[in-house]
Design a protein with these regions (language model features):
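Generic structural signal for beta-strand residues in well-ordered domains
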Residues: 42-44, 84, 123
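C-terminal capping/extension of enzyme domains
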Residues: 6-8, 15, 62-79, 106-169
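Internal catalytic-core helix/loop-beta-alpha segment
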Residues: 46-105
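Secondary-structure boundary/capping signal
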Residues: 24-25, 89-90, 110
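Secondary-structure transition/hinge residues
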Residues: 20, 24, 86, 159-162
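Short, surface-exposed acidic-centric catalytic microdomains
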Residues: 2-70
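Active-site catalytic pocket residues across diverse enzymes, especially alpha/beta-hydrolases
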Residues: 20, 105-106
């Protein structure tokens, strides 16, 4: 896998296009059924969005990518990741497995969190917010525009929308 969310049917990059540009195809290369990775990477760096996995290695127990069919072989160093990102104020764990691994690691009780909610936790003396957002997978039954509304609200809450200028890309 070359990069995050490589599956053309996954909506993560369409969600970001809608949130920041009002254009779900902003990062989509329709002709090649892929994404404009160079532009996407520049955008993420400019805005201050980091992406990482909660698992470094997984084993697929069936032919699907469903969380229930993944066996964790090696977890990521979440503490090391947050230490490497001292300005990080918010985290989205996309998917049930990632959420479970993250909340278990930090002792967060996320059972009562509804879609769009966040809960704060303290890490190395700073407050970090864990956001519960809809999965970007098309298997998650929600319209793309509705998913983008949740994500945009989070980006606004974290101050990323206010500092973003679309003309810089």
């Amino acid at each position: 896998m070359d990069w995050y969310y490589p599956n053309y049917t996954n909506d993560m990059w369409r969600i970001l296009g809608l949130c920041f540009f009002g254009d779900k195809l902003r990062f989509v290369d329709e002709a090649h059924k892929t994404y404009r990775l160079d532009e996407l990477k520049r955008f993420l760096e400019e805005v201050g969005i980091a992406i990482y996995d909660t698992c470094l290695r997984v084993r697929r127990t069936t032919g699907t990518a469903s969380d229930k069919d993944l066996e964790v072989v090696e977890r990521a160093d979440l503490d090391g990741l947050l230490r490497a990102l001292p300005q990080c104020r918010g985290v989205v764990a996309a998917g049930q497995l990632a959420t479970s691994l993250f909340t278990d690691h930090y002792g967060i009780d996320a059972r009562t969190m509804r879609m769009g909610d966040h809960c704060d936790f303290t890490f190395d003396g700073r407050t970090v917010s864990l956001y519960r957002q809809p999965s970007s997978s098309r298997a998650f039954p929600m319209r793309l525009e509705q998913k983008a509304t949740y994500y945009k609200s989070m980006f606004e809450d974290l101050g990323l929308m206010a500092s973003w200028r679309p003309d810089i890309l």
